[in-house]
């Protein structure tokens, strides 16, 4: 039974009502060689080579799939540099000097409505694979693998819930590109031969609700409907969203496709629209840069590969207190990763950068055994027991506590009265459990 949900402090008002600033022409762009799912990669270009926007310039390798690396602007490859990736690790990045011509690779082409209507699921699978489309809500799971399912799909769910505090990138995307999202939903319905889709948002998003009710009315397509879910965290977790939207409760580890459901994030839908309509990979995305450490929190639409340093001073006004130590979080405060500096590159799956003044008074205290972490866990784990097992290096105990069920929602750390980063201990436990 999914019942352990909670209200968390909402800080979206900092930027939620602000339109996204377009910043698409930085002097240099940086493309990650590897990522969390693809630890190895080959480079197809050498220093001094000219590249086109959307050109395949390398190939990432995972255990069971390969993933093309695309240039996100036209220009000259000038070398390799190390920067922080969204996983919090220093990673090799391909550095491209922008020529500001935005010359597109010949592979980019606009398909006619007739050509799109003729595409099969197999055709679309190949397109999204070649465009390296992944889950853009942060999961980075290859979209083409979802398209390869042989299970019959009778419901497509679009996740526009964005339950993390601070982040409003998807909110702005939904308001600014609604027609692209609706068209992409139709492409997915065509691929899966599915006649029902729901766009899931939080019930408090009145502006999105108004926009989509009008658009769906104009489209006159009753196969797609809006689904307003409760204002809880972690309502964006696919298990909770599916339960709320369909009444179906997935078993632990069960894939949604086993129940005839396929779910996508709204950002992934815009990526699907670009891939199907223009044969174009993801070269731009919406992000939120916010937090109490900067003067002007903003939403942006940027090229993938942009350094946040290019945005902080010019658009965000710099730091409010430059002399203070900062906390930099890639992603949301609940599930994101911290990095030690602002040397951060925006990759395809970066949804936000949160910059906070470090609070040195927020010191971890001994556990008081209050049970808050246990009560708040949406998958019914015992985080405090997992933490104690990790501290004792008791691998057998760790495995019995089943930390692999953890979805890393961060509620155990959020609710901890002793300010213990319980989620970090559970992450370590997951590593031990896999050994």
Give residue spans per PLM region:
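Extended boundary segments
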Residues: 1-22, 79, 84-85, 249-252, ...
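Ferredoxin-type iron-sulfur electron-transfer modules in oxidoreductases and energy-metabolism complexes
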Residues: 351-364, 374, 378-435
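Hydrophobic alpha-helical positions that pack around
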Residues: 195-308, 314-320, 332
């Amino acid at each position: 039974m999914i019942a352990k949900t909670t209200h968390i402090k909402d800080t979206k008002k900092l930027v939620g009502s602000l339109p996204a600033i377009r910043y698409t022409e930085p002097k240099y762009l940086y493309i990650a060689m590897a990522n969390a799912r693809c630890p190895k990669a080959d480079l197809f270009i050498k220093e001094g080579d000219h590249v086109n926007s959307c050109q395949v310039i390398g190939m990432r390798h995972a255990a069971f799939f390969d993933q093309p690396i695309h240039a996100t602007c036209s220009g000259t490859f000038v070398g390799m540099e190390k920067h922080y990736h969204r996983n919090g690790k220093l990673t090799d990045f391909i550095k491209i000097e922008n020529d500001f011509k935005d010359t597109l690779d010949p592979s980019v082409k606009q398909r006619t409505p007739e050509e799109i209507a003729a595409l099969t699921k197999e055709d679309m699978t190949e397109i999204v694979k070649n465009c390296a489309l992944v889950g853009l809500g942060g999961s980075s799971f290859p979209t083409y693998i979802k398209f390869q399912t042989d299970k019959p799909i009778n419901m497509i769910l679009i996740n526009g819930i964005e339950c993390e505090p601070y982040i409003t990138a998807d909110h702005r995307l939904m308001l600014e590109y609604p027609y692209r999202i609706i068209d992409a939903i139709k492409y997915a319905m065509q691929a899966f031969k599915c006649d029902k889709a729901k766009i899931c948002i939080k019930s408090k998003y009145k502006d999105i609700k108004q926009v989509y009710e009008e658009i769906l009315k104009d489209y006159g397509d009753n196969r797609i409907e809006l689904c307003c879910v409760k204002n809880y965290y972690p309502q964006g977790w696919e298990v909770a969203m599916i339960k709320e939207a369909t009444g179906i409760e997935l078993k632990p580890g069960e894939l949604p496709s086993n129940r005839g459901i396929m779910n996508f994030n709204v950002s992934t839908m815009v990526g699907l629209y670009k891939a199907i309509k223009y044969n174009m990979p993801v070269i731009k995305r919406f992000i939120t840069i916010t937090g109490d450490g900067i003067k002007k929190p903003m939403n942006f639409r940027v090229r993938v590969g942009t350094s946040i340093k290019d945005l902080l001073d010019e658009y965000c006004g710099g730091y409010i207190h430059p002399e203070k130590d900062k906390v930099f979080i890639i992603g949301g405060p609940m599930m994101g990763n911290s990095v030690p500096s602002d040397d951060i590159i925006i990759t395809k799956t970066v949804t936000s950068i949160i910059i906070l003044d470090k609070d040195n008074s927020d010191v971890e205290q001994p556990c008081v055994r209050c049970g808050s972490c246990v009560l708040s866990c949406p998958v019914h784990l015992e985080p405090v027991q997992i933490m104690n097992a990790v501290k004792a290096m008791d691998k057998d105990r760790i495995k019995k506590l089943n930390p692999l069920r953890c979805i890393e929602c961060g509620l155990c750390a959020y609710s901890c009265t002793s300010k213990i980063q319980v989620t970090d201990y559970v992450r370590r436990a997951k590593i031990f459990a896999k050994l």
